[in-house]
């Protein structure tokens, strides 16, 4: 048991999981050099150097500006995972060209060389683990002193990589196809097929997608985190619309410049850009202002990128094009939804031209077309709210150009207004139906087909008692986006905020359990728990309080391992659950609308109707109050399945079902499989029959138990 008490040994054991990397070519490299003292007399405009331990050779391409013209000694300090290696080098003993003595002016070195002697002994002291651990987090600091007076002349610093990373382009695209494409398909189908099974599938897909977005948000934080966390988040940047396409980047650069902004050129400069990616909170150089993010060859210019700037550069996207890239793919998704809506109507119309009973079917299409098309757009806006809120907050904070800043403000306000409108319309439907305390008011909310097609995504996945719960979740998303976008200059605040938000969400999920089924509550509680653990790790690693560097790196590896395992389990579990729901023989009893029919409420209501006349009871009994709203659409009348008649003369009279949704749900499964044996629910308008049988208790909908899914 002593093995696990040592963080260093634990780190070694975890790293052995990546032993497959030994089969690849081993090397370490550095591609940037920044100054670490004021008035440093040595700087670099270009640096690329790699060491290959297998053949003991080094390849380099260096351009250095020197103001030193004397003999010097070089102190080398290598720091990785809390371990430090220090060496003192005499350039004359090692016969380094241009350094014995050092010469003023530009020093250009390029080529390859096989190392021997002291230089080889220094590099051989590097542990073999440095060549295999993914996302190596190592820093090399070089201090140059005058040999005679021991006066410090220069200080430069570089980060070291080994080519191993948990980010892979293949993983990036596989995750995009596995998570994004199924979500898009079910999202576009959901306004058309209003079945409880589809509601459950869409909600689980959205949950998986939002978990992927959270992973991307971690990599966009300016908080000083281990490099492995940033690389892991890069695998999910597609969920934020960050997909690099060459010609689009050229268009965005032109647009930024033409609208008064100064486009960044870091990616275009390539190896000629002396860019340092911030690691472990070390200030590797002065952070250039956004409006003047360019690279020069002066002795003090070097650029350090953090947070969104860092991830943008790593994804090959200019920092000034970050918002435009994400926004463009959101617009493409909206346009694709429009094409799907238009194509679907065209195809259906063509099919109906050759079918019988054309008048009735055409009337259905025309009746529902507006609701279905609006449902497409509202669902895309709902799913893209996290993406666009973060990108808009970032653009408002940075103001790459006046046009982009205005566009970002318009987009976030427009999306927020549309989602608020959907929520308000839901509240209005409830208020028109009756008081909230009425047993059937919330049941009717789930039977208005046109409302379901447009705004059902706001509440169909929830327990009817918490139909409003999507709205506070959107507010939490907006607050999180503000901390990510506006908090790029306050990394510690970002880390604390992410932890606080995860605590709030976890508490809400555990205490309220707001979703309609036990399975969905379990899923969301599990995701919230994983986000809480991740938030706790970020709080530890954000340097809000002192933590040993080795401990931070171990926590970073554990963070990656837990989130990777959770993502794998979510993908497998959700897809297995989707198959079960789709191919289940009977949908009966799988997705009830649970009302908060407390015993006192049901008792008092039943007592109040005893004094009513039989005719009054026909309109007031909860068994006969109907399954649709007034002036809404009823899917379940056999004589006119898509009618738009007034429901004041319609009542639900299926004796075999406990609640309206029992019949609707089972009928939907029967229709999908062509099973005619299942009795279709129907509406009856003959109140004489109802009055004659108003004492039949079996014909009334009984209150569902409070703990049906608890």
UniProtKB/Swiss-Prot annotation:
It is a multi-pass membrane protein. Residues 1-23 form the signal peptide. The chain crosses the membrane at residues 173-193, 197-217, 322-342, 376-396, 404-424, 466-486, 492-512, 525-545, 555-575. Acts as a key signaling component in the regulation of cell shape and cell wall synthesis through interaction with GTPase Rho1. It is found in: Cell membrane; Golgi apparatus membrane. It comes from Schizosaccharomyces pombe (strain 972 / ATCC 24843). Keywords: Calcium, Calcium channel, Calcium transport, Cell membrane, Golgi apparatus, Ion channel, Ion transport, Membrane, Phosphoprotein, Signal, Transmembrane, Transmembrane helix, Transport. GO terms for biological process: calcineurin-mediated signaling; calcium ion import across plasma membrane; calcium-mediated signaling; cellular hyperosmotic response; fungal-type cell wall biogenesis; intracellular water homeostasis; regulation of cell wall (1->3)-beta-D-glucan biosynthetic process; transmembrane transport. This is TRP-like ion channel pkd2. The keyword Transport applies. Belongs to the transient receptor potential (TRP) ion channel family. InterPro entries: TRP_C, TRP_Flc/Pkd2-like, TRP_N. Pfam families: TRP, TRP_N.
